[in-house]
Swiss-Prot record:
<dbReference type="Pfam" id="PF03446">
    <property type="entry name" value="NAD_binding_2"/>
</dbReference>
<feature type="transit peptide" description="Mitochondrion">
    <location>
        <begin position="1"/>
        <end position="35"/>
    </location>
</feature>
<feature type="binding site">
    <location>
        <begin position="102"/>
        <end position="103"/>
    </location>
    <ligand>
        <name>NAD(+)</name>
    </ligand>
</feature>
<feature type="modified residue" description="N6-acetyllysine; alternate">
    <location>
        <position position="78"/>
    </location>
</feature>
<feature type="active site">
    <location>
        <position position="208"/>
    </location>
</feature>
<comment type="pathway">
    <text>Amino-acid degradation; L-valine degradation.</text>
</comment>
<dbReference type="InterPro" id="IPR015815">
    <property type="entry name" value="HIBADH-related"/>
</dbReference>
<feature type="modified residue" description="N6-succinyllysine; alternate">
    <location>
        <position position="148"/>
    </location>
</feature>
<keyword id="KW-0809">Transit peptide</keyword>
<feature type="modified residue" description="N6-succinyllysine; alternate">
    <location>
        <position position="75"/>
    </location>
</feature>
<protein>
    <recommendedName>
        <fullName>3-hydroxyisobutyrate dehydrogenase, mitochondrial</fullName>
        <ecNumber>1.1.1.31</ecNumber>
    </recommendedName>
</protein>
<feature type="modified residue" description="N6-acetyllysine; alternate">
    <location>
        <position position="59"/>
    </location>
</feature>
<feature type="binding site">
    <location>
        <position position="107"/>
    </location>
    <ligand>
        <name>NAD(+)</name>
    </ligand>
</feature>
<keyword id="KW-0496">Mitochondrion</keyword>
<feature type="modified residue" description="N6-succinyllysine; alternate">
    <location>
        <position position="237"/>
    </location>
</feature>
<dbReference type="Pfam" id="PF14833">
    <property type="entry name" value="NAD_binding_11"/>
</dbReference>
<keyword id="KW-0101">Branched-chain amino acid catabolism</keyword>
Amino acid sequence: MAASLGFRGAASGLWYWSGRRRPVGSLAAVCSRSMASKTPVGFIGLGNMGNPMAKNLMKHGYPLILYDVFPDVCKEFKEAGEQVASSPAEVAEKADRIITMLPSSMNAVEVYSGANGILKKVKKGSLLIDSSTIDPSVSKELAKEVEKMGAVFMDAPVSGGVGAARSGNLTFMVGGVEDEFAAAQELLECMGSNVVYCGAVGTGQSAKICNNMLLAISMIGTAEAMNLGIRSGLDPKLLAKILNMSSGRCWSSDTYNPVPGVMHGVPSSNNYQGGFGTTLMAKDLGLAQDSATSTKTPILLGSLAHQIYRMMCSKGYSKKDFSSVFQYLREEEPF
């Protein structure tokens, strides 16, 4: 791929050669990385996840060029001295390393291929990293379009939630050309503690979809277990403590418990506000369903989880965190 032989970081007259691997400890690698770090990085999508991710790039000394469809969310960055663009195309015109964090496949297609999209102004050799969770087939199509422009596309969806985004402890699942992984890793390590190369474009999305399907199933299971225990006379904090020292322990029980009052600093203790929305979980489960259909893979619990989250969206839970499944099971009595 011609794009893998391009230079990055030229915006300020500093060059970053991305087409040749170097030993991590070599002076050339250290100097190259240091120079590249002084060049602007584009960031598009400043929602619940994108906002803290962008802030962690700032903390690591990266100047940012930002865009969001809602201009108000850019104000605090502008006040901090960062550049705010009027469109994704303007971001691409000013930065040759761009990270996107968007809600859906449709949003990603618009940001990359729309009338004022990245591809209208993208420079040869640019590195485009999409951290949205979208259909793997859409990632592959975007990669083809980006390659035609002489640039490089990598999918790098994340896991860990808003808390990990704030603390810089996200897990990134990266798909794309392996020779470009080190260039992406440099940026992603500023926002995450785990950056894993998964394979070709689309494999990062596949890994994320599998993870979120399991997350939804485990959250429903945790909510059901907690609800059953509470109705059987157990104190919720005591039950959570027992689960978390037993074989039923999982992230949904020990880090993101869905029962109000059991844990501090989680959406369940804030009327299920913030966090990862029910609509987004339903979307991701739909992606898992599509992937299962195309690969002829049975996902019995995944399909049931998809039905439950779709029902929640229709019952007024769409804007609440996905852990509100506890409230849904407790109050709606769906079965």
